């Protein structure tokens, strides 16, 4: 009898020592995770993204629309990417207020619009980056055969398809983004019930992950790998000359933005959806998912600040326009009463910026694409 009591005591002691390691679980198997740090983190990151993203993407759109006039196929993709970033940035003041005050006073409609803008930007950015990567692949690997495919009309059609796809997914997910009132505090885009996750959101998440992340990731990696392999060929090197370094920089920046901003978020989102729908009931994994989700979410929103680097390294005419406009602004700040040198007229500047190359092989692979 004494041995039995000793064994029961040892078993209870072992069970109590293991319980904290499995997470703070209560008697009804619910896992308690404190993720309240996300509000201050999101508010701070959103504030930075709003300031930098608004300035850089507004300036970029001005250059694309009024200086370059979207004369190349790649410029059309990049213009739509900048537009996606700018639309999302314009909704950030509402999110900043919400995260710092932990209260959403703007109503259910703005909550849905804010959620749609976020999803549209994240997955629209990945798809537009994929379009740029595929366009670069066609221009370098098949410079002559791709002439009939790489047209401004086809680029516009592809962009329209991307917008329809991401808006459909964003609106579908945001239909469940209703505001919830708890203790006189209104929340937005959080607090979904387990039933909603199991019935709807888990399926929507899987669809968005496959179409908006896995397929673009495969295409980006594949196209970039083939382009890098093609650049090693002597025939390609003789065509593009010293611009090989520019192409390498462009691919590096492109893949860096994709990997840093989107891979962590989408990887954690998949785990987060499994946890919230209770497909996985391990408390340790649930804690990991709920802690890492807001962190990777902030990384994903930083793409609005990093995308202008892609604009700069992808379009040589964008670099020219950026340099010319910066030079003019600096001259206007420090100009004297009697100008020492005549300034170029605006038509001349526009002509210089929007100059397009001819259709020979080397120029086709560079200026019209990058």
From Swiss-Prot:
<feature type="glycosylation site" description="N-linked (GlcNAc...) asparagine">
    <location>
        <position position="24"/>
    </location>
</feature>
<keyword id="KW-0446">Lipid-binding</keyword>
<dbReference type="GO" id="GO:0070915">
    <property type="term" value="F:lysophosphatidic acid receptor activity"/>
</dbReference>
<dbReference type="GO" id="GO:0016604">
    <property type="term" value="C:nuclear body"/>
</dbReference>
<feature type="transmembrane region" description="Helical; Name=3">
    <location>
        <begin position="113"/>
        <end position="133"/>
    </location>
</feature>
<dbReference type="InterPro" id="IPR000276">
    <property type="entry name" value="GPCR_Rhodpsn"/>
</dbReference>
<feature type="topological domain" description="Extracellular">
    <location>
        <begin position="95"/>
        <end position="112"/>
    </location>
</feature>
<keyword id="KW-0675">Receptor</keyword>
<dbReference type="InterPro" id="IPR017452">
    <property type="entry name" value="GPCR_Rhodpsn_7TM"/>
</dbReference>
<keyword id="KW-1133">Transmembrane helix</keyword>
<feature type="transmembrane region" description="Helical; Name=1">
    <location>
        <begin position="44"/>
        <end position="64"/>
    </location>
</feature>
<comment type="similarity">
    <text>Belongs to the G-protein coupled receptor 1 family.</text>
</comment>
<feature type="topological domain" description="Cytoplasmic">
    <location>
        <begin position="316"/>
        <end position="370"/>
    </location>
</feature>
<feature type="transmembrane region" description="Helical; Name=6">
    <location>
        <begin position="255"/>
        <end position="275"/>
    </location>
</feature>
<feature type="topological domain" description="Extracellular">
    <location>
        <begin position="177"/>
        <end position="203"/>
    </location>
</feature>
<feature type="disulfide bond">
    <location>
        <begin position="111"/>
        <end position="188"/>
    </location>
</feature>
<feature type="transmembrane region" description="Helical; Name=4">
    <location>
        <begin position="156"/>
        <end position="176"/>
    </location>
</feature>
<feature type="glycosylation site" description="N-linked (GlcNAc...) asparagine">
    <location>
        <position position="183"/>
    </location>
</feature>
<feature type="transmembrane region" description="Helical; Name=7">
    <location>
        <begin position="295"/>
        <end position="315"/>
    </location>
</feature>
<keyword id="KW-0807">Transducer</keyword>
<comment type="function">
    <text>Receptor for lysophosphatidic acid (LPA), a mediator of diverse cellular activities. Transduces a signal by increasing the intracellular calcium ions and by stimulating adenylyl cyclase activity. The rank order of potency for agonists of this receptor is 1-oleoyl- &gt; 1-stearoyl- &gt; 1-palmitoyl- &gt; 1-myristoyl- &gt; 1-alkyl- &gt; 1-alkenyl-LPA.</text>
</comment>
<feature type="topological domain" description="Cytoplasmic">
    <location>
        <begin position="65"/>
        <end position="73"/>
    </location>
</feature>
<keyword id="KW-0297">G-protein coupled receptor</keyword>
<keyword id="KW-0812">Transmembrane</keyword>
<keyword id="KW-0472">Membrane</keyword>
<protein>
    <recommendedName>
        <fullName>Lysophosphatidic acid receptor 4</fullName>
    </recommendedName>
</protein>
<keyword id="KW-0325">Glycoprotein</keyword>
<feature type="transmembrane region" description="Helical; Name=5">
    <location>
        <begin position="204"/>
        <end position="224"/>
    </location>
</feature>
<dbReference type="Pfam" id="PF00001">
    <property type="entry name" value="7tm_1"/>
</dbReference>
<keyword id="KW-1003">Cell membrane</keyword>
<feature type="transmembrane region" description="Helical; Name=2">
    <location>
        <begin position="74"/>
        <end position="94"/>
    </location>
</feature>
<feature type="topological domain" description="Cytoplasmic">
    <location>
        <begin position="225"/>
        <end position="254"/>
    </location>
</feature>
<feature type="topological domain" description="Extracellular">
    <location>
        <begin position="276"/>
        <end position="294"/>
    </location>
</feature>
<dbReference type="GO" id="GO:0005886">
    <property type="term" value="C:plasma membrane"/>
</dbReference>
<feature type="glycosylation site" description="N-linked (GlcNAc...) asparagine">
    <location>
        <position position="15"/>
    </location>
</feature>
<keyword id="KW-1015">Disulfide bond</keyword>
<dbReference type="GO" id="GO:0035727">
    <property type="term" value="F:lysophosphatidic acid binding"/>
</dbReference>
<feature type="topological domain" description="Cytoplasmic">
    <location>
        <begin position="134"/>
        <end position="155"/>
    </location>
</feature>
<feature type="glycosylation site" description="N-linked (GlcNAc...) asparagine">
    <location>
        <position position="28"/>
    </location>
</feature>
<feature type="topological domain" description="Extracellular">
    <location>
        <begin position="1"/>
        <end position="43"/>
    </location>
</feature>
